[in-house]
Amino acid sequence: MISDIEFAFSECNFQFAYKDLQKINLYIKRILLLNTRFNLISNSNSNFNSILNLHVIDSLLGLPTIKEINPSEILDVGSGSGFPGIVLAIFDTSRKYYLLERSKKKSTFLKMIKLELDLENVKILEYEIEREKKKYEFITIRAFRSMNEYALVLKNLLKNGGLIMAYKGKFDKINLEVNQIKDLFSKIEVKSLNSKLSLDRNLVLLYR
């Protein structure tokens, strides 16, 4: 299975160390093993290569933007089974990642993975987003919901000059969502995620 990860990463021109591939391999295997117990991903995607291509690769496509902005800490909202937070933390060990997940089941899984993969740069926050009081310079979210459902709540957690990086799908749908929230932010930028293994994906950067 590590050979599959190595091939996929090479196709996307990702830089990696073998120890990181081992962690990703173990992480995917744990999702497959515990999916039924913790309700981590949909059954239609519950095979190794689907998780690798649809979730791991997709999560990593945001890392160049993170390195470009270079925040010291990142809040990942609605981390679920750990996409993108766990994946980013594996390859970005110099930064602190706060993974916010309200579901007890999923946050329990995240705590298990944090320990097993020895991710010292990860902290799991198990509560509703409305309880979070800390301000962040960078927030990630990878959700199927429309941006207008969470834009204001997340904006209130941003430091001045901070930004939200939302993983999104088709560009035409993004335009509709952006028009609904454009007055909330000083600048909105859409970045196309070009990858052989990731179809029609974009990042939306919302600047406070």
From Swiss-Prot:
List of residues binding S-adenosyl-L-methionine: G78, F83, E101, R102, S103, I129, E130, R142
InterPro entries: rRNA_ssu_MeTfrase_G (IPR003682), SAM-dependent_MTases_sf (IPR029063)
Keyword presence, Transferase: yes
Keywords: Cytoplasm, Methyltransferase, rRNA processing, S-adenosyl-L-methionine, Transferase
Keyword Lyase among UniProt keywords: no
Gene3D superfamilies per record: Vaccinia Virus protein VP39
Compartments, as annotated in UniProt: Cytoplasm
GO CC annotation terms, alphabetical: cytosol
The protein's Enzyme Commission number: 2.1.1.-
Pfam families in the record: GidB (PF02527)
One MF annotation (Gene Ontology) recorded for this entry: rRNA (guanine-N7-)-methyltransferase activity
Enzyme's top EC category: transferase
Free-text function comment from the UniProt entry: Specifically methylates the N7 position of a guanine in 16S rRNA.
Family: Belongs to the methyltransferase superfamily. RNA methyltransferase RsmG family.
PANTHER family named among the record's database cross-references: S-ADENOSYL-L-METHIONINE-DEPENDENT METHYLTRANSFERASES SUPERFAMILY PROTEIN (PTHR31760:SF0)
HAMAP family: 16SrRNA_methyltr_G
Protein name per UniProt: Ribosomal RNA small subunit methyltransferase G
Organism for this UniProt entry: Borrelia garinii subsp. bavariensis (strain ATCC BAA-2496 / DSM 23469 / PBi)
Name of encoding gene: rsmG
